[in-house]
């Protein structure tokens, strides 16, 4: 497969010290990138001193790497975790490496996809995902 398109995942930033990718939290290093060596739990949950729920203070996209983007031209369905059937817009296939396992998006996460020829440049919500033999990631958007 010739992976030529681009996939980015949204980072949610909390207190300029932690980032959330999927359901995991990591500290931000001096370069502003996630430090995948130490994982934190429940940084984004809880309440502030006024009793308001903690929310991300900022968000940005980080490059996951190359991928293939396939539009759903046949109105195919994918089954979601809640049992619903969903007609997805795009199917994404991306190669995985050990480094990328910390950046797996989950249902509800936002990703940005960019086609090499510029025909697609969209921010979309992940509706479903799976991994194949720890070598490939498949997303339905």
State each model region's role.
Residues 2, 6, 16-19, 25-141:
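Short, conserved turn/kink motifs that form compact alpha/beta structural patches or helix kinks used as
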């Amino acid at each position: 497969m010739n992976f030529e398109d681009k996939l980015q995942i949204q980072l949610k930033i909390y207190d300029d010290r932690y980032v959330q990718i999927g359901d995991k939290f990591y500290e931000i290093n001096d370069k502003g990138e996630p430090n995948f060596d130490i994982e934190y739990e429940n940084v984004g949950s809880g309440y502030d001193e006024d009793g308001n729920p903690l929310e991300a203070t900022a968000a940005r996209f980080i490059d996951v790497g190359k991928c293939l983007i396939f539009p759903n031209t046949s109105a195919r369905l994918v089954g979601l975790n809640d049992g619903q059937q969903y007609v997805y817009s795009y199917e994404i296939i991306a190669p995985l490496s050990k480094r990328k396992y910390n950046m797996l998006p989950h249902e509800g996460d936002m990703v940005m996809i960019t086609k090499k020829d510029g025909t697609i440049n969209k921010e979309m919500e992940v509706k479903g995902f799976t991994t194949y033999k720890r070598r490939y990631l498949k997303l339905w958007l």
